[in-house]
């Protein structure tokens, strides 16, 4: 688990708490969330307000706050949420997707285990699952859930790494030229 001060240092961004937040109320983060519909343990969650062609994650902050989330990565000033989220913490970054990828890259750097990256146009999930079935009896493996192979899915998969793992199997797919380098 990371605390928000550590994450602020990793992302080189300001950590801002609203008027009712204090240092001893900083959440300990074990879950990264990009889809508000997938909230499980609010008190351990850091929500990344991604801005995509399909929508703006910032609009879900008040709802997530009401459901118990207190830690957010935003690309807009947190001032607009001051009244609706009085006990929230905000990490303000230029680009929330880049911040997600940067945090996952830092987390990966803490582990010295083999990582198998499975790429290609077709068959990534089948190959990953086949390798998992083949090696699972002799290794403690972390793997991408389902088809988490996108610019968002890969960092969420990498975040699952724990000291007990001795092998990682991650899918990586791209939609645009240049995306593989970011993964």
What are these regions (language model features)?
Residues 99-183:
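Phosphate-binding loop of NTP-binding sites
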Residues 1-102:
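N-terminal leader/targeting and accessory segments in enzymes
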């Amino acid at each position: 688990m990371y605390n928000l001060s550590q994450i602020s240092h990793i992302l080189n961004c300001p950590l801002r708490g609203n008027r009712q937040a204090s240092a001893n109320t900083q959440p300990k983060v074990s879950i990264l969330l990009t889809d508000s519909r997938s909230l499980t343990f609010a008190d351990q969650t850091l929500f990344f307000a991604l801005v995509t062609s399909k929508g703006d994650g910032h609009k879900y902050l008040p709802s997530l706050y009401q459901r118990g989330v207190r830690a957010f990565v935003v690309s807009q000033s947190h001032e607009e949420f001051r009244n609706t989220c009085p006990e929230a913490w905000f990490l303000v970054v230029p680009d929330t997707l880049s911040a997600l990828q940067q945090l996952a890259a830092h987390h990966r750097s803490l582990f010295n285990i083999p990582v198998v990256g499975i790429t290609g146009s077709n068959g990534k999930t089948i190959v990953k699952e086949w390798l998992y079935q083949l090696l699972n009896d002799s290794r403690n493996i972390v793997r991408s859930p389902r088809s988490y192979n996108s610019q968002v899915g890969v960092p969420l998969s990498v975040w699952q790494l724990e000291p007990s793992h001795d092998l990682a199997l991650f899918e990586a797919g791209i939609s645009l030229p240049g995306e593989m380098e970011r993964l």
